[in-house]
Swiss-Prot record:
Gene3D superfamilies: 3.10.50.40, Tetratricopeptide repeat domain. GO terms for molecular function: farnesylated protein binding; peptidyl-prolyl cis-trans isomerase activity. The keyword Zinc does not apply. This is Aryl-hydrocarbon-interacting protein-like 1.
Length: 328
C-alpha cells in the first residue's frame, strides 16, 4: 500500500509485507526500538547494500535522540511489533545513509566495541573523511539516490524497561550516574576485576567530559568537573597498572600533570609506571616530588623506592648472567 498519505511525509512509500501484532506501540521519547533492516538500491537487481541479519545483530535506536538518519524514526513509528514492511525513500531522506552505513560496517567488522546503535556524536566526525573506505558507499555519497529499506520491527521498550547507556542520558542523569559508576568501579577493583572496573571508570569519565563541554573552561563549574575527571582517570590508571599497560599510564598521568602540576597521586602513579618500564631517574624524580608535595606519604615512597631498587638489582643480575653465558 502507498503510505505517503498515511505518514504525511513527502518522498516515502510503504508496502506491508507481513502484518504486525497488537496496536501501534507507544513510541514515546526515550523508547528503545529494536529492528532488523535490509537496505537496497532501486536498480533492477535490487542490490543489497547492508543487511543486519547477515551481521547477526539487530539494530537499536532511541526515539527522540537525534538519530542521524531521521527517516528511520519516521518509518519505525508507522509500524506494529512483528510487522515487516518495505519503504521506498527518495533522495531527500537518504543523503546521509553512506555515513551511517560506514559506521555500522565498522562495528560489524569489530572495529568499534559498541553494539549496533549509532548516535549523532558518533557520526559527526565521519564528515571529516574524503573517502568512507568502501567503494559502494563512496559512490552513494557522490551520487545520492533513492533507497529501499525492508524493516522488521522486533521490540519497543519504554525508557524504564531497559538499562540506558550513558551517552543516552540527559545532563542531570549523567551527573547522577557518575558516583554510581565510580563506586561500582571501586568495588570491581577490590575484587580484582580490573577490566570491568576500568570500563566503569571510563563510562563515568565520558559522562563528565560531556558535561564539561557545556561549561566555560577554567571557570568554577568546569574546574569542579575537571577535578572529578582527574580522580577517575587516576583510578583508571590504577587498573592499567594491574593490566601491565604502563605506557598508557605514563600518557594519562603526564597529561594530567601538564595541566595540573600539583596533583600528588598523579606523580605517585606515574612513578610506579616509570619503575615498571625501567625509567629509574624518572621514577625517582616523581617520588621525590610526591614527598615534596605530601611529606605524610614518606612510608609509601620509601616502599616504592625499595621495590624499585630490588627490581633494578634483579635486572642487573640477569644482565650479568647473560654476559657470562655469552662469554662462556
Amino acid at each position: 500500500m502507498d503510505a505517503t498519505l498515511l505518514l504525511n511525509v513527502e518522498g516515502i512509500k510503504k508496502t506491508i509485507l507481513h502484518g504486525g501484532t497488537g496496536d501501534l506501540p507507544n513510541f514515546i521519547t526515550g523508547a528503545r526500538v529494536t529492528f532488523h533492516f535490509r537496505t537496497m538500491k532501486c536498480d533492477e537487481e535490487r542490490t543489497v547494500i547492508d543487511d543486519s541479519k547477515q551481521v547477526g545483530h539487530p539494530m537499536h535506536i532511541i526515539i527522540g535522540n537525534m538519530f542521524k538518519l531521521e527517516v528511520w524514526e519516521i518509518l519505525l513509528t508507522s509500524m506494529r511489533v512483528s510487522e515487516v514492511a518495505e519503504f521506498w525513500c527518495d533522495t531527500i531522506h537518504t543523503g546521509v545513509y553512506p555515513i551511517l552505513s560506514r559506521s555500522l560496517r565498522q562495528m560489524a567488522e569489530g572495529k568499534d566495541p559498541t553494539e549496533w546503535h549509532v548516535h549523532t556524536c558518533g557520526l559527526a566526525n565521519m564528515f571529516a573523511y574524503h573517502t568512507l573506505g568502501y567503494e559502494d558507499l563512496d559512490e552513494l555519497q557522490k551520487e545520492p539516490q533513492p533507497l529501499i529499506f525492508i524493516i522488521e520491527l522486533l521490540q519497543v521498550e519504554a525508557p524504564s524497561q531497559y538499562q540506558r547507556e550513558t551517552w543516552n542520558l540527559n545532563n542531570q542523569e549523567k551527573m547522577q550516574a557518575v558516583p554510581i559508576l565510580h563506586g561500582e568501579g571501586n568495588r570491581l577493583f577490590k575484587l580484582g576485576r580490573y577490566e570491568e572496573a576500568s570500563n566503569k571508570y571510563q563510562e563515568a569519565i565520558v559522562c563528565l567530559r560531556n558535561l564539561q563541554t557545556k561549561e566555560k573552561p577554567w571557570e568554577v563549574q568546569w574546574l569542579k568537573l575537571e577535578k572529578m575527571i582527574n580522580t577517575l582517570i587516576l583510578n583508571y590508571c590504577q587498573c592499567l597498572l594491574k593490566k601491565e599497560e604502563y605506557y598508557e599510564v605514563l600518557e594519562h598521568t603526564s597529561d594530567i600533570l601538564r595541566h595540573h602540576p600539583g596533583i600528588v597521586k598523579a606523580y605517585y602513579v606515574r612513578a610506579r609506571a616509570h619503575a615498571e618500564v625501567w625509567n629509574e631517574a624518572e621514577a625517582k624524580a616523581d617520588l621525590e616530588k610526591v614527598l615534596e608535595l605530601e611529606p605524610s606519604m614518606r612510608k609509601a615512597v620509601q616502599r616504592e623506592l625499595r621495590l624499585l631498587e630490588n627490581r633494578l638489582e634483579e635486572k642487573r643480575e640477569e644482565e650479568r648472567l647473560r654476559c657470562r653465558n655469552m662469554l662462556g
